[in-house]
């Protein structure tokens, strides 16, 4: 059987399993996830053995130390995966929730009820923990899931899926509710992206090149975010101490994540006093500054910023800095160069804060808080499947609710249309 035929069979089986998943009660799904968590811990030795195969292959290929670290499973990381499953089990189940109900003049009662999407495909890179995390979220929201992880983690991913799949069987749920594409070749991804008959949604998790590849080759709707070009605007009346804390946290705490700060905008009225202060702090923290001409008047050691810098997601200790005339120019800059991810304003002016919230066209907008809060857990969603910077079907950090859709439900007592 060819790869194309095998992928089609996996997708068709997942579609059938989705019918069974949609019928499960919240308690049945929670019991399943708790059983899966326990099974991961019990099989720690087996998982580490399978993961060692990936690590040895990665070392032979010359993978970087950082990549090998992302790939590695140990006892603590397996326990963390299990804890993640337990946390998802503790979340409220969105399936079956009636979000609105109203009565028509003819007596019909109309409502909208949350239902699973169906079959979700997750395409990701060399992070075995995503196999368990993504599976938990999809299953809890009543969906089937097809996982295609990076080829570097093929042994780890298959082992995790096999362990979780055994618990599906014990619970009397079709094992096809959780599948892993077992082919490391790119052909496996391409064939998966053709299965629009069976797969309802694709969620890619990884770098910009992976996401663009998926978008360009998929026949299935894709939830995506290419990159996180996140901004902080320091308004004219901002509290300097607060602004400094927010900027340092956004840039320095974890510079390699998508909600890290990449561009700082400073109101011209405070540039002369605030920019030297924040520059001194950031330079002490080993941050490279790239500024416009005005910034470089106050910080001569800053590199001259180019047009590319305003578009850049650095993911390292580099920060682009620009002086703007007012709120209008700050908003215009963000809406031109931003990636619809996360933006923040530091201000004491309520009117300016409200304007910033309304006019900035991004999925998460903060007032007097760090961009690092653009995260499902931090925003109270529980676990997160990813962050979307497209407005269909979801926008911003995605939790369980975002893995559902709604259908209309209508109650009558014999009404017919005149």
UniProtKB/Swiss-Prot annotation:
Pathway(s) of this molecule: Amino-acid biosynthesis; L-proline biosynthesis; L-glutamate 5-semialdehyde from L-glutamate: step 2/2
E.C. number(s) listed in UniProt: 1.2.1.41
Signal sequence bounds: none
InterPro entries (UniProt xref): Ald_DH/histidinol_DH, Ald_DH_C, Ald_DH_N, Aldehyde_DH_dom, G-glutamylP_reductase_CS, Glu-5-SA_DH, GPR_dom
Family the entry assigns: Belongs to the gamma-glutamyl phosphate reductase family.
PANTHER family: DELTA-1-PYRROLINE-5-CARBOXYLATE SYNTHASE, GLUTAMATE SEMIALDEHYDE DEHYDROGENASE
Protein name: Gamma-glutamyl phosphate reductase
Gene name as annotated: proA
